Regions:
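Transmembrane helical elements of multi-pass membrane transporters/channels
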Residues: 44-63, 166, 233-237, 241, ...
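Interfacial/gating helices of multi-pass transporter permease domains
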Residues: 66-86, 154-159, 223-224, 228, ...
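Helix-terminus/linker motif at the lipid-water interface of multi-pass membrane proteins
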Residues: 58-76, 145-154, 210-221, 280, ...
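Short runs within selected transmembrane alpha-helices of multi-pass transporters and secretion channels
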Residues: 96, 166-185, 193-201, 226-242, ...
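Short alpha-helical transmembrane segments in multi-pass integral membrane proteins
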Residues: 2-49, 103-170, 218-277, 333-398, ...
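N-terminal transmembrane alpha-helices
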Residues: 33-65, 69-70, 86-98, 127-134, ...
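Small-residue-rich hydrophobic transmembrane alpha-helices
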Residues: 75-135, 174-193, 307-371, 402-425
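Transmembrane alpha-helix boundary and packing residues in multipass membrane permease domains
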Residues: 49, 53, 64-65, 82, ...
Length: 485
């Protein structure tokens, strides 16, 4: 009895101490304002973005699942081609970010004309660029796959080339969908991009299923149907984006078709590119480094390529809430600074950062015990599943530093602080991930686990530097210094 009372007293003392510690934090005094921020600003932005990203990734997982029935060589081919496609999509997404920030900032200042001009001209410039890029990549497709695939088997290289040549045709449509969705998000409308991108990805699954496996008496196209289905669905999504902008679902961004023929305003283009170009350099160099580490993995055999691809697919699902909160922080920061609310922008970014850290860590630690189950959706090969489990447990162990590495720079970009992120990204990727990944994975023979440890070192360096940038306040260098409220 005495022991039970003593234990109860100890528990109460710990509980009281924890409560007092929470009460003394700056967060507690402002908890009501943070509650308003969460429900009125973060939730309306982040939840549709989260659902949109979830839909995109789940459709990607289902697409991979469809291809996986054709064999691990087909899955490896898609993984290799997509590792290059992701570099291009990252470039488009960086310009999309520039459009989002300029639109959000312009509407914060109630300048609708400038917001529409930024969206329209970004669409024109990036569509033309995507057409040229698609032609060049299609012409040099074999050389690109030979570089990316490294020592992969000829069969895997052939499948990767087929997939690349089909998906490269979708680049103009992907540019339109990304830029248009970014402009709508900058205007605070996240539901329409959710509906369009969600519908586009559902169509991708339906069309790809029919094209791969056939319907009724038609036998289908086999592996080629996967790339063709993706391309067709992206063009449907691009048409939907143009239509939404044309009829003015969001009055602030009504862009008639004939307005695309107007002369370009290079002042606005440079404003968008001033954010988009450093962000695109960051994305291309970062994803180029990822591509190089993919080449390390490609030389380890088909099974290891599948291990890496499956683990990345599952990890991407775990990171979805953080990506959504990062996108929301870009929009919130841009709008706050557009109205001159510098102190609010700083407080709200800190709140989003800590929220992301807690949520992602809880999800990663909660899902790690089920890593083998997730791997079973992709493959039944036991050796592949064992490696995937190791990678996902490592991912969970390092998840507490993920938000500092990825959510904070998203908020900084809303303040147009893009060059610092570019340099940090280059340092983290090329100074840590590539060097450490090669040393651990290839030189020391740790395989794909060593490559992933190099990635976690990149997270740590990025997180430390971005957190220092937040605490120092230097990310607000474009705005007058104010006394913190």
């Amino acid at each position: 009895m005495w022991f039970q009372l003593s234990s109860l007293r100890s528990i109460l003392n710990v509980s009281t101490a924890l409560r007092q510690a929470v009460v003394r934090t700056p967060w507690y005094a402002k908890r009501k304002s943070y509650k308003v921020l969460f429900w009125r600003e973060i939730t309306p932005l982040a939840i549709p973005i989260f659902l949109e990203n979830t839909c995109v990734l789940l459709m990607g997982v289902l697409s991979t699942f469809l291809v996986s029935w054709l064999g691990k060589e087909a899955m490896a081919g898609v993984g290799l081609a997509d590792s290059f496609n992701m570099v291009i999509m990252a470039f488009f997404a960086a310009i999309d970010l520039g459009t989002t920030v300029v639109v959000a900032f312009s509407l914060g200042k109630r300048d609708r004309r400038r917001a529409r001009a930024a969206a329209r001209q970004s669409l024109v410039i990036m569509t033309l660029f995507a057409v040229v890029l698609a032609v060049v990549i299609h012409y040099f497709g074999s050389e690109i796959i030979n570089i990316v695939a490294g020592e992969a088997t000829p069969e895997v290289k052939g499948l990767a080339l087929t997939y690349l040549e089909l998906t490269v045709l979708s680049y103009p449509a992907a540019a339109i969908a990304l830029i248009g969705s970014g402009a709508l998000r900058g205007a605070g409308n996240t539901k329409i991009p959710l509906m369009i991108n969600g519908g586009m990805n559902i169509l991708n699954i339906i069309i790809s299923s029919i094209l791969i496996y056939g319907a009724f008496s038609w036998q289908g196209l086999g592996f080629a149907g996967a790339g063709l289905g993706l391309t067709i669905s992206r063009y449907i999504g691009a048409v939907a984006i143009i239509w939404v902008l044309m009829i003015g679902f969001n009055p602030a961004l009504r862009i008639p078709l004939k307005s695309y023929l107007k002369p370009l305003n290079f002042g606005i283009i440079w404003e968008v590119m001033g954010i988009g170009i450093p962000a695109s350099i960051e994305s291309v160099l970062f994803n180029g480094g990822k591509l190089l580490t993919q080449m390390f993995v490609a030389g380890m055999g088909t099974n290891v390529i599948a291990d890496n691809f499956i683990a990345f697919s599952v990890a991407a699902l775990i990171n979805l809430p953080g990506n959504a909160l990062g996108s929301a922080s870009t929009i919130i920061t841009g709008k706050r600074l557009g109205t001159g609310q510098i102190g609010q922008a700083e407080r709200q970014l800190r709140h989003v950062f800590w929220m992301s850290t807690i949520v992602l860590t809880a999800i990663a630690w909660g899902t790690a015990p089920f890593a083998g189950l997730f791997a079973s959706f992709y493959t039944q090969e036991q050796d592949v599943k064992e490696v995937v489990k190791v990678l996902l447990w490592l991912n969970a162990a390092f998840m507490p530093i993920w938000a500092a590495a990825w959510v904070l720079p998203s908020g900084f970009k809303g303040a147009r602080d893009v060059r610092f992120a570019m340099w940090v990204s280059m340092l983290g990727m090329w100074g840590c991930r590539v060097v450490a990944g090669y040393t651990l994975g290839i030189v020391l023979g740790m395989g794909v686990v060593g490559v992933w440890l190099g990635m976690f070192l990149d997270w740590a360096v990025r997180g430390a530097l971005f957190y220092w940038r937040l605490v120092s306040g230097r990310w607000l260098w474009r705005y007058p210094r104010v006394k913190r409220e």
